[in-house]
């Protein structure tokens, strides 16, 4: 199994991850916004404080995550996100062990972090629950395709 680590994201990570993005993440991004994988990653990279990249040895970006401030003047709320490639599976045990630490790192300055997730994405929903997120409501017609999404929050 490959060794992994997390580092601050670099602009070129967006195109590398986008070209190999997991089909579940591609479907979720499309259903939510009709954005391409590259557009979604670039938006997250530009607006996150800070964006972080998950690396598989030797130096292969396999995921990116961050939190985007949602409040003006008083940054107490953030949208949290993560997108990845199938290669994240190669560092899955380390990823799971370190997930809670990195969640604290990217959300420590906020009172509340939240987002929505495609209801079809059962694996990610289980992971969010394991991280301590609460699923607060189903949105039956979210995004341009009016797909069912679930809003989640961590306070």
Language-model segments: which ranges?
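Conserved GNAT-fold acetyl-CoA-binding loop/helix
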Residues: 25-42
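Conserved acetyl-CoA-binding loop-helix of GNAT-fold acetyltransferases
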Residues: 91-105, 126, 130
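A short beta-loop-alpha structural element at the N-terminal edge
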Residues: 3-19, 28-30
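A short helix-loop-beta-strand connector motif used in the catalytic cores of GNAT acetyltransferases and
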Residues: 41-54, 63, 111
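Conserved beta-strand-loop-alpha-helix junction that forms the acyl-donor binding cleft
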Residues: 110-129, 134, 141-143
